[in-house]
Structure formats: structure tokens, C-alpha cells
């Protein structure tokens, strides 16, 4: 009897970490729904499995941070203003510097800089007016930038999307890679190369 009670108790306790993780993720999601410019929420648990990845929603002016598939942080952002828009796409963190100055824009300070491209796009601490205002970078609050800088690794995945993320507590699926071919490089009806490698006769 005692043994069966102990077994039942042990089984009941097994899912608690997963329940707690999902509960924390939902709390971050709820906070994100009412954030004002400059607001953020960080609830990382370094014991969670999986790498840290980031999804930036340009229309929402929000970023969501995941460890594995669990939402651990959300923040307001300021992306690129008209004419200097932040490019949509999948990126890897190429460089990290706790303090950096822009070599493109008047030596502007870029604390907790995490570079996404070699031509001027990065995540860093900066001013958040509530609308796209940067020269292409993704500005985030200083406290959030510090925590994010400590959590990420070189090569970490960052997705900049032009979508509204309805349920950020559940990490969006990675986009299916799109294969594109250069039409001029494809074999066409005017190709005259035979299987033997010699120019064939026209049909």
C-alpha cells in the first residue's frame, strides 16, 4: 500500500517541471499583450534544454525569446524606419560585443551589440519610441539587452518576420526553406550539349 502511494506520488510529480515551464511561458505571453514602449519581461531558466533563439515581429514591434520551444522573454523593440527598414529573414548571430560604436552613424553607442549582418544590422540597447525609428537595427531595452546578451551564443538563430504572432507562448515553426533557381542557368530547348559532352545536332 505504502509502495503504491509512493509510486503514485512520484508519477504525479513528474510533469510538474513541464507544467511550470508552460505556466511561465503563458505569463510572459500575457505580459507581452499589454506592453508599452520600453517594457519587457524576462523569465529565463538556464536548466531548460535547447538553444536560445529569437523571433522579431516587425508589425508588432516585439521580440520573443525562446530556450528550446519555451518562451522565456518578450520585449518591445524599435526596428528600421521607412527607407532604412530592418530586412526580413533568418539570421545567425555573427558577433557579440558588450559595447560597440557604430562605424556608419556618427559613432553612435550600441550597448550589448549582437551583429546579424556585416552591413549594419544588429540587435542592441537603444531608444524605444513605440514605432520603427532605427537605421535598420533592432533596438531593445537596456536591461533586456543585457540579459539577452548573457543568454545567447554565436550562431544563435534570429528570425525577423513580417507577421503578427498570435500565440507567442508556442514557438512558431521554422519556415520551410525555399529553393530558387536562376532561370538563365537551367537547361533549355536551345541547349545543344549531348550526353557525350559534345555539341549535339539541332532537332
Which ranges hold each PLM region?
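N-terminal pre-domains immediately preceding structured catalytic cores
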Residues: 2-113, 118-138, 142-203
Amino acid at each position: 500500500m505504502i509502495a503504491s502511494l509512493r509510486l503514485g506520488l512520484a508519477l504525479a510529480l513528474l510533469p510538474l517541471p513541464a507544467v511550470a515551464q508552460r505556466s511561465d511561458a503563458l505569463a510572459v505571453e500575457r505580459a507581452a499583450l499589454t506592453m508599452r514602449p520600453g517594457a519587457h519581461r524576462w523569465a529565463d531558466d538556464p536548466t531548460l534544454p535547447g538553444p536560445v533563439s529569437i523571433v522579431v515581429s516587425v508589425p508588432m514591434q516585439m521580440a520573443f525569446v525562446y530556450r528550446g520551444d519555451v518562451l522565456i522573454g518578450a520585449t518591445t523593440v524599435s526596428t528600421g524606419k521607412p527607407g532604412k527598414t530592418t530586412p526580413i529573414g533568418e539570421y545567425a548571430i555573427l558577433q557579440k560585443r558588450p559595447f560597440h560604436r557604430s562605424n556608419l552613424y556618427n559613432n553612435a553607442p550600441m550597448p550589448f551589440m549582437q551583429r546579424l549582418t556585416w552591413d549594419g544590422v544588429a540587435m542592441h540597447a537603444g531608444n524605444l519610441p513605440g514605432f520603427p525609428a532605427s537605421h535598420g537595427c533592432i533596438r531593445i531595452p537596456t536591461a533586456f539587452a543585457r540579459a539577452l546578451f548573457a543568454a545567447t551564443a554565436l550562431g544563435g538563430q534570429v528570425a525577423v518576420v513580417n507577421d503578427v504572432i498570435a500565440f507567442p507562448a508556442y514557438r512558431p515553426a521554422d519556415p520551410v526553406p525555399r529553393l530558387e533557381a536562376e532561370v538563365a542557368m537551367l537547361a533549355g530547348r536551345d541547349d545543344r550539349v549531348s550526353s557525350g559532352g559534345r555539341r549535339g545536332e539541332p532537332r
